């Protein structure tokens, strides 16, 4: 059951209640929500740079966490999250929603069938078009201080897809770039 919604913008949380057909109490203060609503787990869907603080607070309250990717934007934040997981014996799971688009699920199924043979290497390119790419650069994502960078915010989807499709972790990675 949904026991609470927490957002710095209460109107947005009320709108979410309306969209979901729920009547969960709305909070603007995370500490208060954790203390009063006492959730079993929280879903973190905030600006990327805020994830670590929210995750650690929830873990320190004994609450498991499901977070949007990326989990954190800095290495020291990752250390803090891992330490909070260990200290509190709680878990953090990361959501990668690109896995669930029909085309990506189809690729996953095709790769598991014997029809394609064994994959021995991957060359993955992603091109931002004017529709999605332009929109990305108008929102908060464009600010490295809030998203960690285009690489961290966007490319994590693609690294996850390749790992998921192949059921493997990379052995070797190369990158090429140009500012021209």
What is each model feature region?
Residues 91, 98-180:
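Predominantly a Rossmann-like dinucleotide-binding segment in NAD(P)-dependent oxidoreductases
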Residues 16-23, 80, 84-85:
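Short, conserved SAM-binding/catalytic segment
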Residues 36, 41, 47-48, 52-99, ...:
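Beta-strand-loop-alpha-helix segment that lines the small-molecule cofactor/substrate pocket
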Residues 4, 41, 121:
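Short, Asp-centered acidic motifs that coordinate Mg2+ and/or phosphate
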Residues 32-33:
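Short alpha-helical segment
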Residues 23-29:
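Conserved SAM-binding strand-loop segment of SAM-dependent methyltransferases
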Residues 1, 22, 38, 115-118, ...:
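Short loop/turn motifs at secondary-structure junctions
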């Amino acid at each position: 059951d949904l026991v609470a919604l927490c957002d710095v913008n209460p109107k947005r949380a009320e709108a979410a209640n309306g969209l979901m057909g729920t009547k969960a109490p709305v909070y603007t203060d995370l500490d208060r929500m954790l203390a009063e609503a006492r959730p079993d787990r929280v879903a973190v869907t905030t600006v990327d740079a805020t994830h670590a603080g929210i995750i650690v607070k929830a873990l320190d309250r004994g609450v498991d966490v499901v977070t949007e990717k990326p989990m954190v934007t800095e290495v020291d934040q990752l250390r803090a999250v891992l330490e909070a997981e260990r200290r509190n014996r709680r878990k953090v799971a990361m959501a990668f929603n690109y896995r669930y688009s029909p085309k990506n699920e189809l690729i996953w199924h095709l790769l598991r069938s014997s029809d394609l043979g064994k994959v021995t290497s991957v060359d993955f390119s992603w091109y931002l078009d004017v529709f999605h790419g332009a929109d990305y650069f108008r929102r908060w994502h464009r600010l490295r201080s809030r998203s960690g960078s285009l690489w961290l915010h966007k490319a994590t989807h693609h690294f996850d897809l390749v790992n998921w499709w192949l059921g493997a972790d990379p052995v070797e990675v190369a990158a090429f770039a140009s500012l021209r």
